[in-house]
Amino acid sequence: MSFLKSFPPPGSADGLRLQQPDTEAVLNGKGLGTGTLYIAESRLSWLDGSGLGFSLEYPTISLHAVSRDPNAYPQEHLYVMVNAKLGEESKEPPSDEDEEDNDDIEPISEFRFVPSDKSALEAMFTAMCECQALHPDPEDEDSDDYDGEEYDVEAHEQGQGDIPTFYTYEEGLSHLTAEGQATLERLEGMLSQSVSSQYNMAGVRTEDSVRNYEDGMEVETTPTVAGQFEDADVDH
């Protein structure tokens, strides 16, 4: 494959964390051969016995995991997903229709690194996690920034800015229209009726009306309703 190139293997200057020999590389289901996997702080690299291989930049890696599912692949391996289409040569130029269909599909490539020593998978995964953490996604950092409208204090002091408007409850009422005030009064009336009904329903005290809590003390708040269960025993 044309994307395989010759380059010197990563070393200590690249922050090499792990070197795993005798590791098969598989790209999108096609075997690339057996070589050495290099997990360095700067990049992830693989080289075969002839010195040909490839390197992956961590910002392009969207997922890595240890796969032990035989239905996905017959051997346990380190799975790596890359946000790019690698290793495929197009024999025919794509048509305009194909380009439109592919616009909404993000290109990905799937790598599987299969070491002969399966006990090394945990160390490979740990090294990948540590190196990936050194290359945070810039988009994640941008999402933490406040993107709301900023109040320019300096511009306000120069008379060029608008002061954000805040109202107290009383001040807010004065800014209501006649329709708004009528709506507010109607809602307040409905609320007061709702509060009253929860204490007395059909002339019978509800469980919630028996006691109210003031300063952490249980107190009786509603007097006994006349004509209702006068012969009942009440504990005081």
UniProtKB/Swiss-Prot annotation:
Pfam families: Voldacs (PF03517). One of its GO terms (biological process) is spliceosomal snRNP assembly. The keyword Nucleus applies. It is found in: Cytoplasm, Cytosol; Nucleus; Cytoplasm, Cytoskeleton. Gene3D superfamilies: Pleckstrin-homology domain (PH domain)/Phosphotyrosine-binding domain (PTB). The modification Phosphoserine is found at residues 95, 143, 192, 194, 197, 209. GO terms for cellular component: cytoskeleton; cytosol; methylosome; nucleus; pICln-Sm protein complex; plasma membrane. Keywords: Acetylation, Cytoplasm, Cytoskeleton, mRNA processing, mRNA splicing, Nucleus, Phosphoprotein. The modification Phosphothreonine is found at residue 222. Residues 88-109 are annotated as: Disordered. It comes from the Eukaryota. InterPro entries: ICln, ICln/Lot5/Saf5, PH-like_dom_sf. The modification N-acetylserine is found at residue 2. Residues 95-107 have a biased composition (Acidic residues). PANTHER family: CHLORIDE CONDUCTANCE REGULATORY PROTEIN ICLN, METHYLOSOME SUBUNIT PICLN. Involved in both the assembly of spliceosomal snRNPs and the methylation of Sm proteins. Chaperone that regulates the assembly of spliceosomal U1, U2, U4 and U5 small nuclear ribonucleoproteins (snRNPs), the building blocks of the spliceosome, and thereby plays an important role in the splicing of cellular pre-mRNAs. Most spliceosomal snRNPs contain a common set of Sm proteins SNRPB, SNRPD1, SNRPD2, SNRPD3, SNRPE, SNRPF and SNRPG that assemble in a heptameric protein ring on the Sm site of the small nuclear RNA to form the core snRNP (Sm core). Component of the methylosome, a 20S complex containing at least PRMT5/SKB1, WDR77/MEP50 and CLNS1A/pICln. May mediate SNRPD1 and SNRPD3 methylation. Forms a 6S pICln-Sm complex composed of CLNS1A/pICln, SNRPD1, SNRPD2, SNRPE, SNRPF and SNRPG; ring-like structure where CLNS1A/pICln mimics additional Sm proteins and which is unable to assemble into the core snRNP. Interacts with LSM10 and LSM11. Belongs to the pICln (TC 1.A.47) family. This is Methylosome subunit pICln. The gene is Clns1a.
